[in-house]
Amino acid sequence: MDLVLEFCDSYFFDYVYATLLPASLSPKMGGTWQQAMIKEQMVNATRVFGRSLERPLEVYGYAPFMFEVSPHAFGSVLPRYSLLRQSLSLFLVTTVFGWLLYLIVASFSYVFVFDKSVFNHPRYLKNQMSMEIKQGLGAIPYMAVMTVPWFLLELHGYSHLYMGLELNVRGYVRLALEALFFILFTDFGIYLLHRWLHWPAVYKVLHKKHHKWLVCTPFASHAFHPIDGYLQSLPYHLFPMLFPLHKVSYLVLFTFVNVWTVMIHDGEYLSNDPVINGAACHTVHHLYFNYNYGQFTTLWDRLGGSYREPDHELFDSNLKKDKAVWEQQIKEVDEMIKNVEGPADDRVYER
């Protein structure tokens, strides 16, 4: 995350902090503030010195990495290495980029990929897409708050993220293996967490908000309880704390994860692949609840006995919107709702 933060600091935050909280305010802010800042500088300097004995400087905010430092970088009472500034900046970056990525990818999917016959499905909710967007946009800032501590750990050198790379076959193979391991590790972690979220007591408190959508639009991808979304993101943050991962790969994979999350909610069933947990598998999960908990592959569902092969009608452009097929889905869906949520269904359907 240091690459993103340095870019944002260089082109935006340095100027903003220097303008709103200039260094000239320091004498006016009292001894307590100055003592706190001096203490933080001493603690950070000690930490940097201690680590520099064993490995290169990894604590963000003391030395530039990619960009030239402008005068604004030293013009605020909150320098780049300030935990308060880093926390605020990371929250803003995570929230704004989260919103943009969600809206751009989901909108692209809606226009170019999404099968709009879903709107005619008997279990499509009244005003569903607007509710999905409202829920998604509302969840992202809360998720950002909970995610900031992980990014702070990365900024202060507590992860295994690295930047150098051998520009040869060995280096590229390493990147590929890291990405593959990332997918397998996070897929397993999400499988366990997702299955736990379906325990009745947990489901009703956290995960039910996401299962409000029985048939989905791309905007359902991030429409969940913020704690639910945060918990399912934990494997992505835990991985670089345990295993090496290139910093650029980290950013690419995080972007891919968000794109993939939209794709499995787009209702376009391109392939009935026995390995990939695509949109068809995830549609089965939303319709029938207790199957296909995985995010990327069917591996852990197969091993855990929770895999359900998508109905062949989903892959036929005519049959998947056939009224008889929908009626059969409704029977099983309604029975599953009673078993999982109880006899009262608080959803308001379009039809």
Swiss-Prot record:
Catalytic activity line of the entry: a Delta(7)-sterol + 2 Fe(II)-[cytochrome b5] + O2 + 2 H(+) = a Delta(5),Delta(7)-sterol + 2 Fe(III)-[cytochrome b5] + 2 H2O
Enzymatic class: oxidoreductase
Ranges annotated as spanning the membrane: 88-108, 136-156, 173-193, 237-257
One Pfam family per UniProt: FA_hydroxylase
Start and end residues of each Fatty acid hydroxylase domain: 180-305
Gene Ontology CC: one annotated term: endoplasmic reticulum lumen
Keywords: Endoplasmic reticulum, Iron, Lipid biosynthesis, Lipid metabolism, Membrane, Oxidoreductase, Steroid biosynthesis, Steroid metabolism, Sterol biosynthesis, Sterol metabolism, Transmembrane, Transmembrane helix
Cofactor(s) this protein requires: Fe cation
Pathway: Steroid metabolism; ergosterol biosynthesis; ergosterol from zymosterol: step 3/5
Record membrane topology: Multi-pass membrane protein
Name listed for the protein in its UniProt record: Delta(7)-sterol 5(6)-desaturase
Species of origin: Eremothecium gossypii (strain ATCC 10895 / CBS 109.51 / FGSC 9923 / NRRL Y-1056) (Yeast)
